[in-house]
């Protein structure tokens, strides 16, 4: 059986915070404001896997008012959902994601981001694609006040 999930996340950019994308700290003058570390890419991936499993969304599993999750590394959240996916006997067939922000240019970081996601999910990096886009200076990503990410994931039930 195959299952598809879509994920999405958005956060405000502010000074004085780290910019975490795919578990990699990207040098920038602004970082992400969020209850956790605000890693929009890992949140979108987590949300996509949750959706593919039919288990709601990321907010259901990790509410933004839970003080135990304050400033938590988003990789921990993704690992928890990855474990649930494995317990349900699913594996990732393909993961395609997009990070949308005006600056900084992310091309130099894409390979390390992809490799880190593969490490977190314990899969081959060839199953993962990460793209970076701008919105041509339009909207909140264009005026550099926010960042967003999308992800689609294809899961396959393992043969017993």
UniProtKB/Swiss-Prot annotation:
> Which segments of the protein form a coiled coil according to its record?
none
Copy the pathway line from the protein's UniProt record: Isoprenoid biosynthesis; isopentenyl diphosphate biosynthesis via DXP pathway; isopentenyl diphosphate from 1-deoxy-D-xylulose 5-phosphate: step 4/6
Q: What InterPro entries does the annotation carry? A: MECDP_synthase, MECDP_synthase_CS, MECDP_synthase_sf
| Gene Ontology BP annotations | isopentenyl diphosphate biosynthetic process, methylerythritol 4-phosphate pathway; terpenoid biosynthetic process
Gene3D superfamilies, alphabetically?
2-C-methyl-D-erythritol 2,4-cyclodiphosphate synthase
Role: Involved in the biosynthesis of isopentenyl diphosphate (IPP) and dimethylallyl diphosphate (DMAPP), two major building blocks of isoprenoid compounds. Catalyzes the conversion of 4-diphosphocytidyl-2-C-methyl-D-erythritol 2-phosphate (CDP-ME2P) to 2-C-methyl-D-erythritol 2,4-cyclodiphosphate (ME-CPP) with a corresponding release of cytidine 5-monophosphate (CMP).
| Assembly behavior | Homotrimer.
**NCBIfam families noted in UniProt:** ispF (TIGR00151)
List the protein's name. 2-C-methyl-D-erythritol 2,4-cyclodiphosphate synthase
Recorded source organism is Fusobacterium nucleatum subsp. nucleatum (strain ATCC 25586 / DSM 15643 / BCRC 10681 / CIP 101130 / JCM 8532 / KCTC 2640 / LMG 13131 / VPI 4355)
Which gene is annotated as encoding this protein in its UniProt record? ispF
């Amino acid at each position: 059986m195959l299952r598809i999930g879509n994920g999405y996340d958005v956060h405000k950019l502010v000074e004085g915070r780290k910019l975490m994308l795919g578990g990699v700290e990207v040098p920038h003058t602004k970082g992400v404001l969020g209850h956790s570390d605000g890693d929009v890419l890992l949140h979108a991936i987590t949300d996509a896997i949750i959706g593919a499993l039919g288990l709601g969304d990321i907010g259901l599993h990790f509410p933004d008012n839970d003080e135990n999750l304050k400033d938590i590394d988003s990789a921990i959240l993704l690992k928890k959902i990855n474990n649930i996916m494995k317990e349900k006997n699913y594996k990732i067939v393909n993961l395609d994601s997009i990070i949308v922000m005006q600056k900084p240019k992310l091309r130099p970081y894409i390979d390390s981001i992809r490799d880190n996601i593969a490490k977190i999910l314990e899969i081959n990096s060839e199953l993962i694609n990460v793209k970076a886009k701008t919105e041509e200076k339009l909207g909140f990503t264009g005026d550099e006040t926010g960042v967003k990410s999308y992800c689609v994931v294809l899961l396959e039930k393992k043969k017993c």
